């Protein structure tokens, strides 16, 4: 967000906002943009404008390492207790793709991860990059199988601000062309996740 703001010639003011209220904060004009790995979906595009994608990832199941072989596909989630963030695309994806899963929603990540590690839930659905990063730190967990779907994240903006959308896209194009996006990606994710 800081590189983007610099490119746009504006001052950035980072504002910590709970995920389940972040898009509402955009709608109510408490935020001008959401730069927080917001997955671009058809449903969200009805309400918000999105920049060109700046990261690409996927929906990943995170399990205890000892259970990693129990989940390879979405079909394997049937009958399992699966933790997801309340109001996230992971919750919606699970409802749409595996209605036989037992969905447990969470308002915060620490409780969700704790419930996985103590066995209250069988898996968590999160971003593949986050799953790999978490499993690196918590050796008793592992990313199970391949990512379930490709996800592109963009900067969410209010509808009806075409000049801002165009400026953001031009800034992202420049940051991609000069290698800044790739460098930031490798710094934070240890991989180029910009394509």
Model-derived features: where do they sit?
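Extended ligand-binding regions for polar small-molecule ligands
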Residues: 1-7, 67, 81, 86-88, ...
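Bilobed "Venus flytrap"/periplasmic-binding protein-like clamshell domains
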Residues: 1-6, 60-114, 123, 128-132, ...
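Acidic, polar ligand-binding/catalytic clefts
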Residues: 2, 6, 11-76, 147
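Soluble periplasmic/extracytoplasmic beta-strand elements of cell-envelope proteins
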Residues: 11-15, 33, 60-62, 81-83, ...
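A ligand-binding cleft/hinge motif common to bilobed small-molecule-binding domains
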Residues: 21, 36-47, 94-96, 117-149
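Periplasmic-binding protein-like
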Residues: 56-63, 128, 132-173, 189-195
């Amino acid at each position: 967000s800081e590189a983007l703001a610099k490119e746009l010639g504006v001052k950035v003011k980072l504002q910590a906002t709970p995920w389940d209220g972040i898009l509402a904060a955009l709608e109510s004009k408490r935020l001008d943009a959401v730069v927080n790995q917001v997955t671009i979906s058809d449903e969200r595009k009805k309400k918000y404008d999105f920049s060109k994608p700046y990261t690409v990832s996927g929906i990943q199941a995170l399990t205890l390492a000892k259970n990693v072989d129990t989940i390879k596909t979405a079909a394997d989630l049937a009958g399992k207790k699966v933790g997801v963030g309340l109001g996230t695309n992971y919750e919606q994806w699970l409802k749409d793709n595996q209605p036989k899963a037992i969905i447990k929603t969470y308002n915060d990540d620490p409780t969700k991860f704790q419930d996985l590690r103590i066995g209250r839930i069988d898996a968590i659905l999160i971003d593949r990059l986050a799953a790999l990063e978490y499993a690196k730190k918590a050796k008793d967990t592992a990313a199970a199988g391949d990512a379930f779907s490709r996800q592109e994240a963009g900067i969410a903006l209010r509808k009806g601000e075409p000049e801002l959308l165009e400026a953001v896209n031009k800034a992202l194009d420049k940051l991609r062309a000069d290698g800044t996006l790739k460098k930031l990606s490798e710094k934070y994710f240890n991989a180029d996740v910009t394509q």
